[in-house]
Curated annotation (Swiss-Prot):
Its EC number is 4.2.1.59. Pfam families: FabA. Belongs to the thioester dehydratase family. FabZ subfamily. It catalyses: a (3R)-hydroxyacyl-[ACP] = a (2E)-enoyl-[ACP] + H2O. One of its GO terms (biological process) is lipid A biosynthetic process. The active site is at residue 50. One of its GO terms (molecular function) is (3R)-hydroxyacyl-[acyl-carrier-protein] dehydratase activity. Its main location: cytoplasm. This is 3-hydroxyacyl-[acyl-carrier-protein] dehydratase FabZ. PANTHER family: 3-HYDROXYACYL-[ACYL-CARRIER-PROTEIN] DEHYDRATASE. It is found in: Cytoplasm. Involved in unsaturated fatty acids biosynthesis. Catalyzes the dehydration of short chain beta-hydroxyacyl-ACPs and long chain saturated and unsaturated beta-hydroxyacyl-ACPs. It is an enzyme of class 4 (lyase).
């Protein structure tokens, strides 16, 4: 059961196809944690070139998936509602396993620090029971230009 579907996700963050890397939110505790899902399919545009005959989800797009989940967590906090979360830093990123078409990527994010217009989160992505990626992400929250939504 999902807490937020794709339409509801797009009401919170500005990302759209082909750069929206989240299908739904499974769990959400505003200001604390979020778990979201990305179903990785062979139809993803990036598989055309990464790599033909050996499709692998680029690690930077796993980080982007985690960043999008983190943005929702941050923007569901009362003080940041209606704003945009911009990725400011990536620390300690580690990639532990290849992600391929057919994998279900579970995106886990936990808020570790929130101060003024900044937030720091610990993230990791799982496929089944295997951790495929982890990173600490820092966000800066700013105004949103609503005319493009």
């Amino acid at each position: 059961m999902s807490i937020l579907n794709t339409t509801e996700i797009m009401e919170l963050i500005p990302n759209r196809y082909p750069i929206l890397f989240m299908d739904y939110v499974d769990e959400l505790e505003p200001g604390k944690s979020i778990v979201a899902t990305k179903n990785v399919t062979i139809n993803e545009e990036f598989f055309q070139g990464h790599f033909p005959g050996n499709p692998v989800m680029p690690g930077v797009l796993i980080i982007e998936s985690l960043a999008q989940a983190a943005s929702i967590l941050i923007l569901k906090s009362e003080e940041f509602a209606g704003k945009t979360a911009y990725l400011g830093a990536i620390n300690g990123a580690k990639f532990r396993q290849i992600v391929r078409p057919g994998d279900v990527l579970k995106l886990h994010v936990e808020m570790i620090k929130k101060k003024r217009n900044m937030g720091v989160v610990e993230t990791f992505a799982m496929v089944g029971d295997k951790k495929v990626c982890q990173a600490e992400l820092t966000f800066i929250v700013g105004a949103t230009d609503k005319k493009d939504k």
